[in-house]
Amino acid sequence: MTTTLQQRESASLWEQFCQWVTSTNNRIYVGWFGTLMIPTLLTATTCFIIAFIAAPPVDIDGIREPVAGSLLYGNNIISGAVVPSSNAIGLHFYPIWEAASLDEWLYNGGPYQLVVFQFLIGIFCYMGRQWELSYRLGMRPWICVAYSAPVSARTAVFLIYPIGQGSFSDGMPLGISGTFNFMIVFQAEHNILMHPFHMLGVAGVFGGSLFSAMHGSLVTSSLVRETTEVESQNYGYKFGQEEETYNIVAAHGYFGRLIFQYASFNNSRSLHFFLGAWPVIGIWFTAMGVSTMAFNLNGFNFNQSILDSQGRVIGTWADVLNRANIGFEVMHERNAHNFPLDLASGEQAPVALTAPAING
């Protein structure tokens, strides 16, 4: 008997690279989206850390009054931020090579654009990588669909809103207090609290938290005991076991009696789809709300107060909200504007055009 051995041709470096990138046997899956995700997220993270620590003040309003955001210029972890690029730059793409010098690039807030653009590309690729890994493993694509909710929210805040407002200086600062400042100014200029899409987003986030807590507590309370009373119930679960780890019938019966029968799911698959869909849809609506308000399609306003038959104002919550918004707007960009538009567009006050004659 004769055995013939044929030497296998060695794969090229490109083929080896392709096999490594798409292999699901790696400890961490890379994927084709990962080849772009890894460098962009590393770039964004590195630039953010350096800018947060040591970036010089930025002329955010374009009026030659720089605002310091880094730690070395007097801020702490709470007040520090990567300050958005200058209003003098507007929506222009502002990479390092567009500036006359590195100092000019830093003064005009170039690091903000670098971090934001690299970060957005990175999270887009992360979402694509989730789909890619699901496809390789034969899974359904709902993981990347769920992740599209925070991706759409970040895109609305960092890209769509500055485009609608005409300048990246209106983007959200990359810091804790900068985030809150952005929220307050957004309320002042767009009345987001009175926008129905924001209300749906609040229902999605808080409702999702409630449903998650309810589900986790119900499951934990109806675990099937596989251990003695002196051992933790967690030891009764073996990874990959075929048996149910909790009694869904008991959980269904408890919740159905606690509220009413049809408030409880009797199908585990529909239950978990609901738990995933509720917050995702809510955050989608919030992202759509921010994207529409970016072009000044704002929340409901009740600027006309309710008057009685004598013409006196009947105070309502809308009046309180309007005064708060005007107060926020007065504090915002106080050196760039004299008055917010709500105050500047009121009735004109009579002024003296000629000086009175003084006879001494």
UniProtKB/Swiss-Prot annotation:
It is a multi-pass membrane protein. Keywords: Calcium, Chlorophyll, Chromophore, Electron transport, Herbicide resistance, Iron, Magnesium, Manganese, Membrane, Metal-binding, Oxidoreductase, Photosynthesis, Photosystem II, Thylakoid, Transmembrane, Transmembrane helix, Transport. CDD domains: Photosystem-II_D1. It catalyses: 2 a plastoquinone + 4 hnu + 2 H2O = 2 a plastoquinol + O2. One of its GO terms (cellular component) is plasma membrane-derived thylakoid membrane. The record marks 161 as: Tyrosine radical intermediate. A quinone binds at residues 215, 264-265. Belongs to the reaction center PufL/M/PsbA/D family. This is Photosystem II protein D1. It comes from Synechocystis sp. (strain PCC 6714) (Aphanocapsa sp. (strain PCC 6714)).
